[in-house]
Design a protein with these regions (language model features):
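Transmembrane and membrane-interface helices of multi-pass
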Residues: 1-154
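Solvent-exposed soluble domains appended to multi-pass membrane proteins
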Residues: 167-495
């Protein structure tokens, strides 16, 4: 499964960049790897005697064939039973819908998933885009009357007219979908941070469990003094980090089975509502992105420039002065803040790496080991917390520099994860941090979204259910940016 997707998306080289983690994963499970070869060895040694089909009569072979055909027909019929279901995990939608590799593999097996993946790669696939069937012309409710007094977050695109003027079926489906969507509206938080500088941080494997008053006081301060999104969820997308970035930065759902950000850059797709592009449109003086790992990992050098940023990373303008894994978030801040701190206006994006998995042996966990050594957790969990202390040090440094430059009160800082710390799964580490057995259907995806500015006088509790898809539209509203809310998968949390 992984090999097919990686190779078809140009990711073979990325696998070699993580060869140390791959080898560690294999050696830690060597017993199970050896067991995989036991059936093959058994067949080689005893197969000739136990599986001699030459003695089976034609009648017996026909019976076996008929049973196999019956099973195949039954399976096909079972797939079609729930074809009208709206459940994306129904048998029908898993088989005929957008390819969800992990779910399809679990339901139909590895070979079926690979066959579907390869066939769609070779022959293409047309998605079935469903439009909102709710009628537009209905009796106004009290909520709708209130909304008429507000302003819809839309732009001048006339999707009804565009639908009539195109013969392209795919474009027509998109226009119809956008036209059917209910827009977000201006609200009490519209323009709250208009004119502010913005620093957006996607923190590797970050979670709410990394926020601690004693271990990570700066992260704790930002959460407890800022917007507190109590029901925020971060899905585990198919391509982990880069798909998490895609959702965070575009407000769109990444396509399963491909590197969505990489493919979008390859196809020169425009993202007019990203903070990078919006900042350039407004004449922002400095629009930079940074990453403290290899510059072209996941093709970041292509997709971050495609959404409006001037990009620096290891091997492309950023030298941290040490060759370790993972690299230090603190050192990245120390090396980059001077690039923009004195600019009249700046829009900055960071993709951190200190929190990367492999917590029992990596450099960041070891660097801060003394600070967690007395905690009553397993070594893996202590390593995870130690790695996030490095992120906290980076944020402490950033806030101190902003305050010294007199820009803490007019800078909005947004920090969230790319995905939950799934490297802890095999050690049941997330449950250990939570203090109870974590539900793997929903609870494990609950996370923290830190949104804070030095100008905030008191925290704001937000109990609305939201996800990483909602970050961009929410920020766009709060920064007073012009955007069309119908064209994003996420929605403004307050709109």
């Amino acid at each position: 499964m992984v090999v097919v997707s990686s190779v078809t998306n140009g990711g073979a080289g990325q696998a070699f960049n993580s060869i140390d983690m791959i080898m560690t994963a294999i050696t830690s499970r060597i017993v199970f790897v050896v067991l995989l070869f036991v059936p093959l060895a058994f067949f080689i040694i005893f197969g000739g005697k136990l599986f001699d089909f030459s003695k089976v009569k034609l009648k017996g072979k026909l019976i076996v064939l008929l049973i196999a055909v019956a099973f195949q027909i039954g399976t096909v019929l079972a797939v079609g039973i729930d074809r009208d279901s709206s459940d994306t995990k129904s048998n029908y939608n898993l088989y005929y819908g957008e390819l969800q590799q992990v779910a399809v593999c679990e339901r139909y097996g590895l070979y079926t998933m690979q066959r579907l993946d390869i066939s769609r790669l070779m022959f293409g696939y047309k998605a079935n885009i469903r439009t909102n069937s709710k009628p537009k012309n209905k009796e106004s409710t009290a909520d709708e009357i209130t909304k008429t007094e507000q302003k819809a977050q839309i732009m001048s695109a006339d999707f009804s007219k565009l639908t009539k003027n195109t013969n392209n079926d795919e474009l027509k489906s998109l226009y119809e979908y956008f036209d059917s969507e209910e827009p977000s509206y201006t609200n009490e938080y519209t323009g709250m941070f208009k004119g502010y500088n913005i620093i957006f941080i996607t923190a590797e494997s970050f979670s709410q469990y990394a926020i601690d008053k004693d271990l990570t006081p700066t992260l704790w301060k930002m959460y407890n003094e800022g917007f507190q999104f109590e029901n925020y969820y971060s899905p585990a997308w198919g391509v982990s980090t880069t798909d998490g970035e895609y959702a965070n930065l575009t407000g769109l759902i990444p396509k399963s089975g491909v590197w969505s950000f990489s493919k979008s850059a390859e196809n020169n797709v425009s993202f007019p509502f990203t903070l990078g592009e919006q900042s350039r449109k407004l004449g922002c003086k400095t629009v930079n992105a940074y990453h403290n790992h290899t510059y072209d990992y996941y093709d970041r050098d292509k997709y971050l420039t495609n959404i409006g940023y001037d990009y620096s990373a290891i091997g492309k303008g950023l030298d941290l002065g040490e060759n370790v894994w993972p690299n230090s978030d603190l050192k990245m801040m120390q090396k980059t803040v001077d690039d923009y701190i004195n600019s009249d206006s700046f829009s900055v994006y960071y993709m951190t790496v200190s929190g990367h998995g492999g917590y029992s042996y990596n450099t960041m966990s070891e660097r801060n080991a003394d600070l967690v050594k007395d905690l009553k957790y397993s070594d893996e969990v202590k390593g995870y917390l130690a790695a996030n202390i490095e992120l906290d040090k980076a944020m402490e440094y950033l806030l101190a520099r902003l305050e010294k430059a007199g820009k803490l009160d007019n800078t909005l800082i947004c920090l969230t994860d790319d995905h939950y710390p799934y490297s802890l799964d095999e050690f049941d580490g997330v449950s250990e941090l939570a203090g109870h057995k974590v539900d793997t259907t929903f609870e494990q995806y609950k996370n923290a979204w830190l949104l804070w500015s030095g100008s905030m006088k008191e925290p704001v509790k937000v109990d609305t259910y939201c996800s990483s898809l909602d970050i961009l539209p929410t920020l766009s509203n709060m920064l007073g940016l012009e955007y069309d809310s119908r064209m994003l998968a996420g929605t403004d949390v307050f709109g």
